[in-house]
Regions:
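Tandem repeat scaffolds
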Residues: 1-191
Length: 191
């Protein structure tokens, strides 16, 4: 995995935890049951790649491109995605643990977050226009100066979003989620 470029390769049960990978390109590759915990990817590129059942906790994507990359049932805890290269940044998440991660200043329009744990995730100055948070746990996640226009929170839970600090035009919320929009006002809402 360190002497690429790699195209249409399948990587299964690879353990590169706490390793450093430099200037590698992976295109149309699949990673299954791999351990990349605390791995440092520097100046790498992942294009049209799929990660399934992988541990990527505390990975450092230092100036690394994630271009149309899907993560399914992966552990992605404590990742600072702001270190990723911004050019064509495009990711999707399903059944993932994203707790304690940060997406500072990322453009993530239409990003699907499906059935994810997102406890204490930081969204600051992020464009999440039309993003979908389907069945996500957003307990103590912070949204600061984000664009959430047309985002879908209808099945998300435990979120707190300040409407005065975020753009929410045409965002979708369920009636049960209204308390998360009014929390700062100390209003008791009963259903």
């Amino acid at each position: 995995m360190t002497s690429g470029p790699y195209d249409h390769q399948v990587f299964d049960k690879i353990d590169l935890s706490e390793q450093t990978i430099l200037k590698q390109e992976y295109q149309n590759c699949t990673f299954t049951n791999c351990n990349f915990s605390k791995t440092v990817f520097t100046n790498c590129s992942f294009i049209d790649c799929h990660f399934k059942d992988c541990n990527l906790s505390v990975v450092n994507f230092n100036n690394t491109g994630l271009k149309t990359v899907t993560f399914a049932n992966c552990k992605l805890m404590g990742i600072n995605f702001s270190h990723c290269n911004d050019f064509l940044f495009n990711v999707s998440f399903k059944d993932c643990q994203l707790d304690y991660s940060s997406f500072f200043k990322k453009k993530m329009q239409k990003t699907p977050f499906l059935q994810c744990s997102m406890k204490e995730v930081q969204f600051e100055q992020v464009d999440l226009t039309q993003a979908v948070f389907k069945d996500c746990n957003l307990m103590e996640a912070s949204f600061t100066n984000t664009i959430l226009e047309k985002a879908d929170f209808r099945t998300a839970s435990y979120y707190t979003i300040d409407p005065e600090m975020n753009k929410l035009k045409k965002a979708k919320f369920s009636q049960s989620g209204l308390a998360g929009l009014l929390a700062k006002y100390g209003i008791d809402i009963e259903f």
